A protein has these predicted regions:
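A general secondary-structure signal for short beta-strands and their flanking turns/coil
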Residues: 13-15, 89-93, 128-130, 143, ...
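A glycine-rich, hydrophobic loop/mini-helix early in the fold
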Residues: 43-93
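Short acidic, glycine/tyrosine-flanked loop/strand segments centered on an H-E-D-like triad
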Residues: 64-72, 98-103, 146-159
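Beta-strand-rich interaction surfaces with strong enrichment in secreted/lumenal proteins
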Residues: 82-84, 137, 160-163
Length: 204
């Protein structure tokens, strides 16, 4: 089948609004369930497959993806120069910032535990929480939606709360993106780590 390359106006979006949903590790989103996701949805799905909205995220610091490694090396043979290109191992992360300073955020990002009476306590030694993440964004001008699914992510806080007098207090976390056992392999037989849902996937 030919690649679906061409001019597709519905694929052009701005990330005006967005939300991050979390579920147990290796949870996959079916095509039927995908259509239920909106940025305002508190939960999507039921039981072990339920996705929970992490709430208000920063509008100043949107989720930021980063790759480390992946440098190219060109190898030659005695017979031919520049015979083959190989790439170093690549690792991916996403950093996101909540502005919702409730106990749920601290229990999710900081592994906090309830104290007697009031408050939560957390260690400065990071312990990752293994979850599936779905980062959803929406263009309010077109009502188009798109999203990235990270089924196998290790989440931990990346900083202590960032205070501000002219913006919301932010609570930052970073997820290390790992290979998934539930996503399909790519056409080269490699394990995959990320799934992308295009605007057309939300309407079909």
């Amino acid at each position: 089948m030919a690649d679906e390359i061409g001019i597709h106006d519905d694929g052009v979006l701005t990330a005006v609004r967005g939300a991050i949903f979390m579920a147990k590790a290796e949870t996959i989103i079916t095509s039927a369930l995908l259509k239920q996701f909106t940025v305002e949805a508190a939960t999507v799905g039921v039981g072990d497959d339920m996705w929970t909205n992490l709430g208000h995220m920063s509008n100043d610091n949107l989720p930021e993806f980063a790759l480390d490694g992946g440098d190219a090396t060109t190898l030659s043979t005695w017979l031919k120069a520049a015979f083959r290109t190989q790439y170093a191992q690549t690792t991916g992360t996403v950093t996101f910032n909540s502005v919702q300073g409730d106990k749920g955020t601290f229990k999710t990002f900081y592994n906090a535990v309830d104290m007697t009476g009031a408050g939560v306590a957390f260690s400065l030694e990071k312990t990752p929480v293994n979850k599936s993440l779905f980062i959803l964004w929406s263009d309010t001008n077109t009502t188009g939606r798109a999203g990235l699914l990270l089924p196998n992510s290790d989440i931990a806080f990346s900083s202590l709360p960032a205070l501000s007098t002219d913006s919301f207090v932010e609570f930052s976390a970073q997820a290390n993106i790992k290979t998934s056992s539930t996503l399909p392999h790519d056409k080269n037989g490699k394990f995959t780590s990320v799934a992308y849902f295009a605007p057309s996937d939300f309407t079909v």
